[in-house]
Amino acid sequence: MKTKTESKKCAPKATAKKVAVKKSANVLLERTDKVVTKDKNSVLKIFGPTYKVSAILNEAMNEARAAETGLPVAKVLEVLKLRDHWCIRREWIEGKTLAETMAGDKKNLMRYLKEFVAIQCEIFSKTSERMGNLADKLDKQISASALPKETRYDLHMRLQSMPRGKALCHGDFNPTNVIITPSGDWRVIDWSHVRLGDPLADVARTYLLFWLSGHVAAAEKYMALACEALKVKIADVQKWLPIVAAAESSKEQSVKNHELLLHWASVVDYE
């Protein structure tokens, strides 16, 4: 593996203020400038002031478009404004995430990973005429990254040479976003990053998500299974890794993850 000159070390962007919620709220997830709570039989995603209204509406629209493909997703019920915060209300899905299931039954990791890959391939089999392309999003994120100008240029050129694709790509496909219902059915949630693109780019991002969460062994097993299912070589996915890592580094990350992503983004070739 060859790397370019070490990129300058840059700390992640400053964090935005957290969204304030009632003490009685059933908080499911808390991230920078957004909170997800359970509200009776629905899930409420509450956005902070840094989110543009157009981006929130677009997220809801993309989730509706994903549902129109026939995939089992959490349906968007409404977009509303509560206490000066824009929100998206979705249906509540009973069950456990695949991440919880895997953590509680580690001896069957390979079986769960195979199911995980099968679900992702089912998503790849869908498309939509009214959805943005992943390559365009990656291009903008590379421009916004903290990488040196020369490295960003190289990545832009590499991205232009990669296939754009028209497959539905979840954009944040990881075991925490797959829910297994009591009946054994699966539902995929959090479609805020969905785009059309090359499936291998989405596989590369999922691989990085395993890495960033500390599940390195699972990342390698996932990569092998995904490549086998898609009938491609691991090297084909690895071509996307620097591009996807650079794009991911443009978001807020812990210092450790940020530096890891900058390293991946500096990779020029795989041997």
What does each model-identified segment do?
Residues 125-171, 181-182, 266-268:
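An alpha-helical support segment within catalytic cores of ATP-dependent transferases
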Residues 35-38, 157-201:
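Active-site acidic catalytic loop and adjacent metal/ATP-binding pocket
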Residues 84-97:
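Conserved short submotifs of the Hanks-type protein kinase catalytic core
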